[in-house]
UniProtKB/Swiss-Prot annotation:
This is Putative spore germination protein YfkR. The lineage of its organism: Bacteria, Bacillati, Bacillota, Bacilli, Bacillales. It comes from Bacillus subtilis (strain 168). Residues 1-20 form the signal peptide. May be involved in spore germination. The keyword Nucleotide-binding does not apply. One of its GO terms (cellular component) is plasma membrane.
Length: 384
């Protein structure tokens, strides 16, 4: 009889142990944040969050960018003397619990970045719920406006921001990477810049987002935003350029050629000369002629090599100009200091000096070794 009772009671006791849903949180009670924007106005931080409206996603037709004629996302913002206070104020206005474990992008406003991003990264890295693989971007103007931009190709702006951040550099700038450059000695952080724009289809333009430069930091402060040739050259120094293109002015005013680099790699050699740092930058790349608006032929002959030499001159000029601009800013995203410390061709006397003084007086030598692999199917230009 006792054995029978034990056999009946034991399964019941096991069932009690298996009921592990007492502290459950229903998915309908959670607000999943996909992107955040942080701005600063005077002594106030303003935090904006973008939350997808799940009920509006999928199974519907019409509307731009995969929407059903109504927004598939919701943006709310709040201000506070600290970022945490702003987050708490946001929570009081939401009927669901904020969850940032699915956040994929964080946008920092330009004014906030110039004032210093240390408070942002303190809260982003201290809470284990936050993802260290979130992508970091800096906005032109206010970051909140980026989240409020109606995009045409994606269901919500956060996805467009993420895709743009990924294609901006060959290796995306994650939160963890930015923090590593910020904390460690030897290099400064950088991040892509995003801005809102209008399309120009011929009538009333629609809103859109675009990558609008490269943010250069000195420690935690934004120093400058590089665009055009300086952005391209900086990305090549960082080995972050994704198929950069150069418009090359050819000799004797014979026109221009557009050349795309398929593979590029920058290597550095630090040495000491006459008590000063000498940095040799070797750039190796292979290119393709994408457009030829000159009288030069693009088959392998003397004219072909003239175009190749002109490309090497252009790259050398742009890289030297970019390094000099970085020296004036006292910013070192390329890690010249780290390469100097690791070099066996520098003395202890040089390393004992203040880095900013060494960096300011650094001599730069650029050695481009760029070859054009393809001139295209058409050797001669039609217009000439």
């Amino acid at each position: 009889m006792k054995k029978t009772i034990y056999k009946c009671v034991l399964p019941l006791l096991i069932c009690i142990l298996l009921t592990g849903c007492w502290d459950r949180t229903e998915i309908n009670d959670i607000a999943f944040v996909v992107s955040s924007a942080i701005d600063k106005k005077k002594d106030q931080y303003r935090v904006a969050m973008q939350i997808p409206l799940v009920g509006q996603l999928g199974g519907q037709t019409g509307g731009g960018g995969g929407t059903a004629g109504s927004k598939t996302w919701y943006v709310d913002s709040a201000s506070g003397t600290t970022i945490r206070e702003a987050n708490n104020k946001l929570q009081t206005s939401l009927s669901r619990t904020i969850n940032t474990s699915h956040r994929r992008t964080v946008i920092i406003g330009e004014d906030m970045a110039r004032d210093g991003v240390a408070p942002v990264f303190d809260i982003l890295t201290r809470n284990p719920q936050n993802r260290l693989t979130a992508l970091i971007l800096v906005s032109r103007g206010e970051a909140r406006d980026i989240l409020n931009t109606d995009v045409q190709l994606e269901q919500f702006p956060a996805e467009m921001i993420r895709e743009l951040a990924i294609i901006a550099t060959s290796r995306p700038v994650f939160l963890s990477r930015f923090m590593s450059d910020l904390v460690e000695i030897g290099s400064d952080p950088y991040a892509p810049v995003i801005s809102a724009s209008k399309t120009k289809p011929g009538g009333k333009g629609k809103s859109n987002l675009k990558i609008d430069g490269l943010a250069i930091f000195k420690k935690d402060r934004l120093m400058d935003i590089f665009k055009d040739e300086h952005m391209t050259a900086a990305l090549m120094l960082l080995n972050q350029a994704r198929q950069p293109e150069f418009i090359v002015d050819l000799p004797n005013q014979m026109g221009q050629a557009s050349i795309q680099l398929q593979k590029s790699n920058a290597s550095f050699h630090a040495a000491e000369k006459n008590g000063k740092l000498s940095m040799t930058i070797e750039i190796r790349a292979k290119g393709i002629i994408m457009e030829n608006q000159s009288t030069y032929e693009t088959r392998e002959n003397d004219q072909y090599y003239i175009i190749q030499k002109a490309l090497n001159r252009t790259i050398k000029k742009d890289v030297i100009s970019t390094v000099h601009r970085l020296q004036k800013l006292k910013a070192d995203p390329a890690g010249f200091q780290d390469r100097t410390i690791r070099s066996t061709a520098t003395t202890k006397n040089l390393l004992k000096k203040e880095w900013e003084e060494v960096y300011k007086d650094m001599e730069v030598h650029v050695v481009p070794i760029v070859t054009i692999e393809q001139g295209g199917v058409l050797y001669k230009t039609i217009s000439h």
